[in-house]
Amino acid sequence: PTLIGNKNSIAETAKNLSLDISNFKIVEAKDEEDSASVACQMSNENRSKIIIKGNLHTDILMRSYLRKEFNLLDGRRLSHIWHMTTPQLKKPLFITDGALNVLPRIDIKLQILKNAVQFYNKLNSHKPKVAILSGTEDPIESMPSSADAKKVMELASEEKINAFIHGP
């Protein structure tokens, strides 16, 4: 892994969290914009497979990501994945999409699901468990997100997305 940012701040944070980052590469960056640019440039040059945002504003990373010179757009829908760990859970949670897509159509929701599964598979070797959430367990007309969840599950099954998918 490569960490990008203020080396002293990175080292202090790792120490405070009791994390051993001695095998990590650390690239100095002067500020958030520089960190985002360095990450996108590294991805453009195939020196990284995934950009994982830490203590960096999403809008700053997205501005860099969208710059044409980095050539990172591949025609797929962009989506946001939040990686969450807690002491109570033995496995991390990946939550999508909480930051980029507002009121997505069903086809966009399916693409967001595909993005999340593809991301997960870059980090893990086993089949992910996916929960498509809504405010109710069964699809009902008065809650469109529940009907959308059912449709996304059906489409995911047809497309044979390699994940255990349940919901709403």
What are these regions (language model features)?
Residues P1-P168:
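Anion-binding alpha/beta catalytic cores of soluble intermediary-metabolism enzymes, centered on
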